[in-house]
Amino acid sequence: MSHLTMIKTLNLRPFHSASALRKIVITSILGVAVTMSGCSLLSVYKIDLPQGTPITQTQAQKLQVGMNQNQVLYILGSPAIRDTLEPNRWDYIYDYQAGTEARRKGIADVKNASQHLKVYFDNNGIVTGIQGLESLPK
């Protein structure tokens, strides 16, 4: 069989079928969508995530060694942690993570923040020490 007769018997049709073209376009669009889903352009929306109660320098400056537990509760509110293994220490913890909107808008003063204030008491419930004042915003 010569090459010419083989070409005639193959029944080659030009690629004009509309349904085949439609399949290629749909497959291409789906491929691009799947590829783009891994990019940051189509990221998941994240909310601002504040956890705990924020404490300011103004509040912390009202704390003094010699205060009782009720006075500390009045100024700062309930602590985030009252450790059963160390009952003479109260931990005030605040953590903030900026969400999608703050990042997209590029707000300069919105950033992730973390605070950890520790208040120590003696056995009579009187403040003996305060740690973590440097982690509080001004």
Swiss-Prot record:
Species whose genome carries this gene: Psychrobacter arcticus (strain DSM 17307 / VKM B-2377 / 273-4)
Function: Part of the outer membrane protein assembly complex, which is involved in assembly and insertion of beta-barrel proteins into the outer membrane.
Cited HAMAP family: OM_assembly_BamE
Localization in the cell: Cell outer membrane
Quaternary organization: Part of the Bam complex.
UniProt similarity note: Belongs to the BamE family.
PANTHER family, per database record: OUTER MEMBRANE PROTEIN ASSEMBLY FACTOR BAME
Cited Pfam families: BamE (PF04355)
Record protein name field: Outer membrane protein assembly factor BamE
Main location as per UniProt: membrane
Gene Ontology BP terms: Gram-negative-bacterium-type cell outer membrane assembly; protein insertion into membrane
